[in-house]
Regions:
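Periplasmic-binding protein-like
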Residues: 130, 163-167, 195-201, 207-208, 239-263, 277-299
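Extracellular/periplasmic bilobal clamshell ligand-binding domains
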Residues: 299-333
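Extracytoplasmic ligand-binding site segments that recognize negatively charged/polar headgroups
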Residues: 36-43, 80-219
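C-terminal motif of bacterial Sec signal peptides marking the signal peptidase cleavage site
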Residues: 20-23
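A bilobed periplasmic-binding-protein/Venus flytrap-type ligand-binding module shared by bacterial periplasmic
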Residues: 135-140, 255-270, 286-289
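A ligand-binding cleft/hinge motif common to bilobed small-molecule-binding domains
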Residues: 90-94, 219-242
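Early extracytoplasmic/lumenal segment of secretory-pathway proteins
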Residues: 26-93
């Protein structure tokens, strides 16, 4: 009986050891990706990466722009992040050598992209360009006996009081691109005077803290005119809203977001493979589904009701952190 128990115990221990060994051998390599993208875009990227790389445990995690920028600036090359899928160029530029030079890596070809979107440092690759627009609920304006505005100066007329929504540049990249474009076209002093006048016509408690504030205000009928992102307005139109998309003479302000690898991790072959797939498949699919504005020289995408000829504005200084810090320092709201 003792012999039988001994044999059973030995077999049990052997099975446990084999199970433990198998578990260890099946442990997947973790690759961590951070992005400031909307949740549905992150979900799509996560699904594509999981299907392409079942041998890896790839985590695509959301962080707000400010949170991710601060995290990467504080942690530098020692961060847990391997790949940045999407972050505003201004903040990527500020990271300097904390992000890797990408020349020579698989599938990295800066000649594929519009030259104005390619950084001189070659440390990040364009992911999306997203423009701002004036979204108008014409029916609400008609109800109030008001015409559709045709220029920025119309927005500061007293008859539009309480009908306009714009994000605060201090807390929203959307608000900042409108602000910067106004500075570039009118000069800093005149631009600040303009936004002082516009503040008197804003709905609710003034400039919204979130970039999605204006489109939400339009949906709720709290505003008739929203300074928002083009894709936000198109999304609502495709869901049944009767909005008009306007671009004034100054053109559409815009921002560019890009992808990067943390410095020191660009030599890891697994990270190289994931980053290459991000460029060749995930980025184009994101354009096809959500953000069709052109980033490639010879490749375009279309989405129902999305403007195809967007007149882009003068966005000098958009990637310059010193310019942004200076302008936000004098912004009083």
């Amino acid at each position: 009986m003792k012999k039988i128990l001994s044999v059973l115990l030995a077999v049990s221990m052997l099975v446990s050891a084999l199970f433990l060994l198998a578990s260890c051998s099946e442990k997947k390599k973790v690759i961590t990706i951070y992005a400031t993208s909307e949740d549905f875009r992150i979900k799509n990227a996560q699904q594509m990466l999981n299907e392409k790389f079942p041998a890896y445990k790839i985590k695509v995690e959301y962080r707000s722009t400010g949170e991710l920028a601060a995290k990467l600036a504080n942690e530098g090359k020692k961060t847990d992040c391997d790949i940045v899928m999407e972050l505003e160029n201004t903040y990527l530029e500020k990271l300097g050598d904390s992000i890797a030079v990408l020349d020579g890596l698989p599938e990295v070809n800066f000649d594929n992209y519009l030259p104005e979107l390619v950084p001189a440092s070659h440390r990040y690759v364009p992911f999306i360009r997203t423009s701002g627009t004036i979204a108008v609920n014409k029916a609400l304006l008609t109800e109030k006996g008001l015409p559709v505005p045709t220029c920025y100066d119309d927005l500061i007329k007293p008859e539009y009081k309480g009908l306009i929504s714009m994000p605060n540049p201090k807390s929203s990249g959307t608000g900042y691109v409108f602000y910067l474009n106004m500075v570039n076209t009118r000069g800093e002093e005149k631009a600040l005077e303009y936004f002082d006048a516009l503040a008197k016509n804003l709905s609710g408690s003034g400039y919204t803290s979130s970039g999605s504030g204006p489109i939400k205000a339009l949906k709720l009928g709290e505003a008739a005119i929203g300074l928002c992102m083009t894709w936000q307005a198109v999304d609502e139109i495709n869901n049944g809203a009767s909005y008009e998309i306007l671009y004034f003479a100054e053109g559409a302000p815009y921002n560019t977001y890009s992808s990067a690898i943390i410095s020191g991790k660009e030599t890891d072959e697994d990270i190289q493979k994931v980053f290459a797939y991000l460029l060749t498949d995930v980025t184009p699919k994101d354009k096809e589904l959500y953000a069709p504005e052109q980033i490639y020289k010879d490749r375009t995408f279309t989405i129902k009701n999305f403007p195809t000829d967007i007149p882009y504005a003068d966005m000098r200084g958009n990637d310059d952190t010193a310019v942004k810090e200076k302008l936000l320092d004098v912004w009083k709201y």
